[in-house]
């Protein structure tokens, strides 16, 4: 792991609507650094510098700048939920009875406190939020759904059990950024 790395939390949904999130022009070195770190978050600075084609000190400065500017939000290990006993993955579509800003924030706070919810996305259209949830078994998930449907302003919840994951790619397609 690179020295000086710290986890930076992902911003709330409300902050994603702020206009100051415009991407700076990333140069070729920035994109190479991001691609290498995205492929291997445990890469050493010396190895990263070699792969990117620069010396270690400017490489480390580049990584720190990308961290400070929020391009690198943190470093995590990818774990296998099934091997850890989380055999059930479900997507839950949540419809709220109110879309007032305070109610949306309250729902987001509710979801952040729920350990079975691994991702929460606010959507436009027929569904207000979609949640990706994991559970050790269906009984545990059903208890969570009962709890979720009782939350303030939740009008209804529809769930879809994952049968098979055909693709999981956490990486951002940087090759498209380089072309565009």
Regions found by a protein language model. Name each.
Residues 1-180:
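A compositional/biophysical signature of low hydrophobicity enriched in polar/charged and small residues
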